[in-house]
Design a protein with these regions (language model features):
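Intrinsically disordered, low-complexity regulatory regions
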Residues: 1-115
């Protein structure tokens, strides 16, 4: 893969990640709290929001792992009947960011408790 091809792929993913993060935001939060979904599910399960985000991330990692190991995937955004492998990568990267946000918030809360 050339540098130009790599940069094009990176740009394609960054554009999709941003668009999908904003689109899915409306499905999982009713206001400004970007972590509302993780907090609510964490409350239901007796977990921390970061643990919920990690579980969601792992679902996508497992799906990507299976696709790579079996070679059974469509390298596109969509495939007949669902998401293509590119979409799963974008979702995983977005969940990494949301997990980082959970940990950032957690670190701030812990810092407040110790000061």
């Amino acid at each position: 893969m050339t540098s130009i091809e790599f940069e094009n792929l990176r740009d394609e993913f960054l554009t999709k990640e941003s668009a999908i993060l904003e689109w899915k935001r409306g499905e999982y939060t009713s206001g400004e709290d970007r972590l509302q979904n993780f907090r609510e599910v964490a409350g239901f399960l007796g977990q921390r929001p970061a643990e919920v985000a990690l579980s969601y991330l792992m679902k996508h990692i497992q799906s990507i792992t299976r696709a790579v190991r079996t070679g059974n995937y469509v390298w596109d955004w969509n495939q007949k009947g669902g998401e293509g492998l590119k979409q799963r990568f974008v979702d995983a990267r977005n969940y990494l960011l949301l997990l980082a946000a959970c940990l950032e918030e957690e670190a701030g809360i812990n810092k407040e408790r110790t000061t």
